[in-house]
Amino acid sequence: MLVPQDYRIPFGIGYLLGTFFLSPDLDLHFSKPSQRWKFLKFLWFPFWVFSRHRGITHVPFLGTLVKLFYLIFIFFFLYFAVLGVLSILGFAPKELLSFDPFAFINEFLKSEKGFFFILGLIVADLLHIVLDIVSSFIKRF
């Protein structure tokens, strides 16, 4: 196998998430990957507004990175929104205040496990794109 044994789990998780939740077809609000987000589907509404089907999400590597950066942006936005609301209400727990989301994301992206997780996402997207091309070619005949 091409993935070292120590990194098969992060790669596998990335591949499964990339296949079932972060597919290039996530740019369609009615697609299966979009439906799998259930009640969190609303998080993708801005993404649907600014992307067209088979647009940037179907560009190898770039589509994966765009979705990943979008999720990171949503993570930061929600973290600071929740932190702000809890602070206003006087309920901000010390664990939440001491958590550094920038350091967390930075360490994850620099780690080998993070690399293989992202590689799993990329492989899932590449396979999806190849299957789209093959199925489109077959439909022509």
UniProtKB/Swiss-Prot annotation:
Provide the leader sequence positions: none
Tell me which UniProt keywords the record has, alphabetically.
Answer: Cell membrane, Membrane, Transmembrane, Transmembrane helix
Per the record, membrane topology reads: Multi-pass membrane protein
Extract one GO cellular component term from the record.
plasma membrane
Q: What transmembrane ranges does the database entry give? A: 7-24, 39-56, 69-91, 116-138
Which InterPro entries would you find in this protein's record?
DUF2227_metal-bd
Q: Which parts of the chain are coiled coil?
A: none
Grouped into one coarse class, the protein's main location is membrane
Q: Where in the cell is it found?
A: Cell membrane
Concerning Pfam families, the annotation shows:
DUF2227
Q: What is this protein called?
A: Uncharacterized protein aq_2157
Lineage of the native species?
A: Bacteria, Pseudomonadati, Aquificota, Aquificia, Aquificales
